[in-house]
Design a protein with these regions (language model features):
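Short helix-initiation/N-cap motifs at beta->coil->alpha
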Residues: 68-77, 170-174, 261-276
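Extracytoplasmic/periplasmic substrate-recognition and gating elements
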Residues: 59, 63, 84, 256, ...
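Glycine-centered hinge/linker elements that transmit conformational signals in sensory
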Residues: 177-180, 223-264
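A local structural motif
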Residues: 34, 58-68, 86, 158-166, ...
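Extracytoplasmic/periplasmic solute-binding protein
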Residues: 132-136, 141, 173-232
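C-terminal capping/gating helix-and-loop segments adjacent to ligand/active sites or protein-protein/ligand interfaces
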Residues: 324, 366-373, 386-442
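Conserved N-terminal structural module of periplasmic/extracytoplasmic solute-binding proteins
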Residues: 6-10, 22-98, 111-116, 120, ...
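Hinge/lid segment of periplasmic solute-binding proteins
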Residues: 94-151, 304-310, 381
Length: 449
């Protein structure tokens, strides 16, 4: 009898185990993902993503349905899609402010393979140590300089500084000393001035009212440990206005043209001046190489084009890197099933780690990828893109993130640009510029609510 009971018990256990495995098998079949959806932000690369989708399905069997929002309609399109059965599994935000709008749909990506391979973790959108947005491309800007002209300066017998190479220029004081001495020696160097013209024509002033202005805003928010997803970004005190003025004055006073004439100058004018070696330096981003190399009569060789951080005279100058960032962050829909979330994470990791995917990223999408999965021969050949990557890989250097995504409005930026032109022309004093920046930031932030 005992033997029979033992056999019966073992039989029941076996039947239970078989039932359990069968149940799990059905669950696995139910959870098997055949497709995911991606809402693409960039219409100009929609066709490339169609190719990528086809390749990925060929290699993995998973279909990536790529939908693309029309220009300037991404937020509206995302909002409409999220309320339907066609909600994207993969979407994007533009930074901390975008995360604040979509945090209920952003999955934790801290343990994702793509985030683990992010070269600089500070570039991600993070909250309380967890990553919710992973940048899929980066761009950067700083002071572009012509190494050949700088070498010519360092070799001058009559130069007034002791500096011998750009490797020694690690703070604003050093930069100022070299720039002002170069301006005095412009005839010997064969230039019209050190810096290209500070383009302050309306519509061409974004390098100053946005890109340069990013520095004091970043410095203030960092100093005060501001939560970038909070309402604390609705006001600023412009605490680092003096530092902004330091570098802006250096640009104005050591230029190829008089400050009073800058109201008609464009970005194209500045890049042409640099390309034709009328100057040694210009502030701009890695996208500028195509402008420089495309200028008729360009004299600047690819091997001579380098980057220097925009030093402004803060205590952190010597550890400051380039301004590197993006307005493009991958997010995985936390409302999708776990299997769908995993499939989305697998897709973006494949795109940035497989040979096929990396070829698309570098050569067809044209991205500078911020991940350590790329070998040297898989990285962009553009000299400024290479400089961005070189600065990112420097030990002890802190990249300046793009906090200008938090600027309250285009009106704020336009007003700031107009005030900078008035300052350059001598019709507005700096204190008035400071007050306008503080007041406009508050009023435009309030109007946006």
């Amino acid at each position: 009898m005992k033997s029979f009971k033992k056999i019966l018990a073992l039989t029941l256990v076996a039947l239970f185990t078989l039932t359990l495995f069968a149940s799990c098998g059905k669950k696995a079949e139910k959870d098997e993902v055949k497709e995911i959806r991606y809402l693409n932000f960039k219409p100009e690369i929609a066709d490339v993503y169609k190719e990528i989708s086809a390749k990925y399905e060929e290699e993995t069997g998973i279909k990536v349905i790529v939908q693309t929002a029309a220009n300037n309609t991404y937020e509206q399109t995302l909002m409409a899609k999220m309320a339907t059965d066609e909600a994207p599994t993969l979407f994007q935000i533009n930074g901390p402010r975008g995360y604040a709008n979509w945090k209920d749909y952003c999955a934790d990506l801290t343990d994702s393979e793509l985030y683990k391979h992010l070269t600089d973790k500070s570039l991600a959108v993070t909250v309380d140590g967890k990553a919710y947005g992973v940048p899929y491309l980066i761009e950067g800007y700083g002071i572009i300089y012509n190494q050949a002209i700088m070498d010519k300066y360092f070799a001058l017998d009559k130069k007034a500084t002791e500096y011998k190479s750009m490797d020694e220029i690690k703070n604003f004081d050093a930069l100022k000393a070299v720039v002002e001495d170069m301006q005095k020696n412009k005839d010997a160097l064969g230039n019209d001035g050190v810096f290209a013209s500070t383009s302050l024509k309306a519509g061409d002033d974004w390098r100053w009212q946005t890109h340069l202005a990013n520095l004091p805003v970043y410095q203030e928010f960092t100093k005060n440990n501001v939560d970038l997803t909070s309402d604390a970004t609705k006001t600023i005190k412009f605490e680092f206005a003096k530092n902004y003025k330091n570098i802006f004055d250096l640009y104005l006073n050591n230029s190829v043209v008089e400050a009073s004439k800058l109201g008609t100058k464009t970005v194209n004018d500045s890049m042409a001046e640099f390309a034709l070696e009328k100057c040694a330096m210009v502030q701009n981003g890695n996208w500028a190489w195509s402008q420089i190399s495309g200028v008729s009569g360009n004299k600047v060789k690819a091997e001579n084009i380098k980057y220097l951080p925009i030093y402004t005279g803060t205590d952190d100058d010597e550890t400051q890197g380039l301004c590197i960032g993006t307005e493009n962050f991958f997010c995985v829909n936390s409302q999708a099933s776990e299997a769908e979330q995993k499939a989305a994470k697998d897709f973006i990791y494949w795109l940035y780690s497989s040979k096929t995917g990396k070829d698309y990223v570098t050569n067809k999408l044209g991205f500078i990828a911020p991940f350590d999965t790329f070998d040297d021969d898989e990285k962009p050949t553009d000299p400024l893109a290479q400089e961005i990557l070189r600065w990112m890989e420097k030990d002890g250097i802190t990249t300046v993130p793009w906090n200008f995504t938090l600027f309250p409005s285009q009106t704020f930026k336009d007003n700031f640009g107009a005030a900078l032109l008035q300052y350059a022309q001598g019709t507005k004093d700096w204190k008035a510029v400071e007050k306008q920046v503080i007041d406009d930031w508050a009023s435009e932030s309030a109007a946006a609510q």
